[in-house]
A protein has these predicted regions:
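Targeting-peptide/extracellular-domain and disordered-appendage signature
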Residues: 1-138
Length: 138
């Protein structure tokens, strides 16, 4: 990204952490990560979107498996504040601002041989098996 002449960005360590909850009805503070391991041919993405003024957080885990199938889960988990990225079995921890973090998930995921089944999420969740996934990654 090229900034206009005279403009600059200054990120402070505290900018990496949670922000004060605003009064906006649709206030949303979210964080997500895309990951890929070319050696293991596995990738995925993980997201938490806090909507504290609505009383919930959206949690999504999606792992692309080497055989083309996916492990997926989405939840709207109850939250009461915007104090942390921790909802629905997922947690993001800032270990060192802008350098290191931990992604944790402990819960069920849907195993889908055919990812296009998510065109109809209700049907996909009814017709595919679930398994437990413990994830703790830095």
């Amino acid at each position: 990204m090229k900034l206009p002449e005279g403009a600059y960005l200054k990120l402070n360590p505290e900018d990496e952490y949670m922000h004060p909850l605003g009064s906006e009805v649709n206030f949303n503070e979210s964080m997500y990560f895309n990951v890929y391991d070319p050696k293991g041919k596995i990738g995925g993405w993980f997201r938490i979107g806090n909507r504290a003024n609505e009383g919930n957080a959206e949690m999504t885990a999606c792992i692309y498996l080497p055989d083309g199938s996916i492990a997926f889960m989405f939840k709207r988990a109850k939250i009461a504040n915007n104090d942390a990225f921790k909802a629905g079995g997922m947690e993001f921890i800032i270990d060192e601002p802008y350098k290191a973090l931990t992604v944790k998930y402990s819960g069920e995921v849907l195993l889908m041989k055919n990812p296009t089944e998510m065109i109809d999420p209700s049907k996909a969740f009814k017709n595919n098996p679930k398994c437990f996934l413990p994830l703790n990654s830095q």
